[in-house]
């Protein structure tokens, strides 16, 4: 079936507007994506027709809202091929997901002097949470270097493992360089040392199929707004055995089972990590976004982006006015434009 770009553009109302007298061309999807009409409609419909708190009431609207919320969790599970909805935790986004793991993992699994490995190409949301934990808990951050092609130096990674290495946290796709990291190999290397892996999938999920069981990552995180969903909603996938072992990140609301002044018991997974009233409208809209791209086909999206990437690279390479950064022949990248004159090869 043909990839009908014109038809797909019609699904995005904002793309029908003019900017400075010309049709809008939007290239900032690495920061946030525009929203198809079906996602906006899902938000409006829930507020107009279903709005009620979830997991809290026995009345009709609450039950209906809860069903939509948990159906969204199942949609996410299916989209990334997790084993169980118990492994799908809703958060505010990739940044909060990483902070959740950093806080709970350090509290439950690390001691002063223990080490976490990150890469030199990480987004600051996968650097600063670990720096905060280093200041508070005395853990040590070790960094995987990159070479002049913008790729991880895997041999150097191997040398970073020590008996005190407790976690590797690495991007699936770099938001700056666009490098698609060999996550399966990284996970296999880490697991050979008995070390779990967190993968930042914020820039991967919108562009390629993601199968968390195939990757074998212990944690995988992404944001809804980068995959045509609403802002303020994100996902933490965690293997059930790891989520069971970690302490809660925040307290109150959804995450409690019983409360008394003598002690509190916590809800079962995944609610154990979902304190407060969840963004149940956001989860429904996220599910609609994932259904939307699934209907188009993630394989077809990836193939079309590859065609665009190859054409863009060709045009860039014959231009004498554009500075190129990155390995031109590296086919697993597309193009990032920065200030219109600097070009980085990436998957963004």
Locate each region found by the language model.
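Pyridoxal 5′-phosphate
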Residues: 1-348
């Amino acid at each position: 079936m043909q990839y009908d770009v014109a038809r797909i553009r019609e699904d995005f109302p904002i793309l029908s507007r003019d900017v400075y007298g010309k049709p809008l061309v939007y290239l900032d999807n690495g920061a946030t994506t525009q929203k198809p009409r079906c996602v906006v409609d899902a938000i409006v419909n829930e507020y107009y027709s279903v709005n009620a708190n979830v997991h809290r009431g026995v009345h009709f609207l609450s039950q209906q809202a809860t069903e939509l919320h948990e159906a969204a969790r199942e949609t996410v599970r299916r989209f990334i091929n997790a084993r169980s909805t118990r492994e799908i935790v809703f958060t505010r986004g990739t940044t909060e997901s990483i902070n959740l793991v950093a806080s709970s993992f350090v509290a439950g699994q690390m001691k002063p002097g223990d080490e976490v490995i990150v890469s030199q190409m990480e987004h600051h949301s996968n650097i600063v949470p670990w720096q905060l934990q280093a200041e508070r808990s005395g853990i040590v951050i070790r960094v995987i270097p990159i070479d002049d092609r913008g790729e991880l130096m895997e041999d150097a990674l191997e040398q970073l493992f020590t008996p005190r290495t407790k976690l590797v946290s690495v991007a699936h796709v770099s938001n700056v360089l666009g490098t698609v990291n060999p996550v399966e190999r990284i996970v296999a290397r880490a697991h050979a040392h008995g070390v779990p892996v967190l993968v930042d999938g914020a820039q991967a999920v919108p562009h390629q199929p993601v199968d968390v069981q195939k990757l074998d990552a212990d944690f995988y995180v992404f944001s809804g707004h980068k995959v045509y969903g609403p802002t303020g909603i994100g996902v933490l996938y965690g293997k059930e055995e790891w989520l069971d072992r970690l302490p809660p990140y925040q307290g109150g609301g959804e995450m409690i089972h019983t409360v008394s002044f003598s002690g509190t018991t916590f809800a079962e997974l995944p609610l154990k990590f979902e304190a407060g009233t969840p963004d149940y409208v956001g989860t429904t809209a996220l599910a609609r976004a994932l259904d939307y791209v699934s209907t188009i086909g993630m394989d077809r999206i990836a193939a079309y982006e590859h065609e665009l990437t190859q054409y863009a690279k060709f045009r860039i390479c014959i231009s004498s006015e554009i500075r190129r950064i990155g390995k031109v022949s590296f086919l697993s990248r597309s193009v990032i434009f920065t200030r219109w004159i600097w070009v980085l090869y990436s998957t963004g």
